[in-house]
């Protein structure tokens, strides 16, 4: 009888241990799932933080790159005036030669300074017309060049760091229209 009681006690102990083992296994599984979820969330937060940091760096870079845009745009009429003054003055007139040389030097210094800040002129004379960089002011028939070629530049365009600041104002070629026969030729 004592053996039976021992066997019953052992069976009960084994059943209790098995129940406790199942409970512990379930508990470990739940904790592992929670740990995996926490690690996943941690990785997502780190990735989001990295994306925010990268966007902020790009915004600062763009701000630095294009901070001069308004200022450079305000300087363009001054460059145009200096160039127009040189175009309208005669290089052979001795009475204005010192003034002309001063304007040329000033313009060169101005252009060199603007180049250092990535402001570049667009002078498309003889190039194919591009609506992205040019503004057609007129069309002119020409048999000498391909249609859609820039014949004349009224005003240079400018770009800052590759971004268009002002389009070049141009005259664009078009194919000559066929000659209409005169009344005498028709008869």
Curated annotation (Swiss-Prot):
* Keyword Lyase (UniProt): no
The answer on whether this UniProt entry bears the keyword Isomerase reads no
The biased composition feature labelled Low complexity covers 7-22
Region of interest: Disordered: 1-22
The record ties this protein, via Gene3D superfamilies, to:
3.90.20.20, Head domain of nucleotide exchange factor GrpE
Q: Name one GO molecular function term.
A: unfolded protein binding
GO BP terms: namely: protein folding
Q: Which UniProt keywords apply?
A: Chaperone, Cytoplasm, Stress response
A GO-annotated cellular component: cytosol
Instruction: List where in the cell it is found.
Output: Cytoplasm
Q: Which stretches are annotated as coiled coil?
A: none
Q: Which InterPro entries match?
A: GrpE (IPR000740), GrpE_coiled_coil (IPR013805), GrpE_head (IPR009012)
Output the PANTHER family linked to this UniProt entry: GRPE PROTEIN, GRPE PROTEIN HOMOLOG, MITOCHONDRIAL
Subunit info?
A: Homodimer.
Q: What does this protein do?
A: Participates actively in the response to hyperosmotic and heat shock by preventing the aggregation of stress-denatured proteins, in association with DnaK and GrpE. It is the nucleotide exchange factor for DnaK and may function as a thermosensor. Unfolded proteins bind initially to DnaJ; upon interaction with the DnaJ-bound protein, DnaK hydrolyzes its bound ATP, resulting in the formation of a stable complex. GrpE releases ADP from DnaK; ATP binding to DnaK triggers the release of the substrate protein, thus completing the reaction cycle.
Instruction: Please state which protein family the record places this protein in.
Output: Belongs to the GrpE family.
Which HAMAP family does this entry report, sorted A to Z? GrpE
- Identify this protein by name: Protein GrpE
Q: Which species is the source of this protein?
A: Pseudomonas syringae pv. syringae (strain B728a)
Upper classification of the source organism reads: Bacteria, Pseudomonadati, Pseudomonadota, Gammaproteobacteria, Pseudomonadales
Give me the gene this protein comes from. grpE
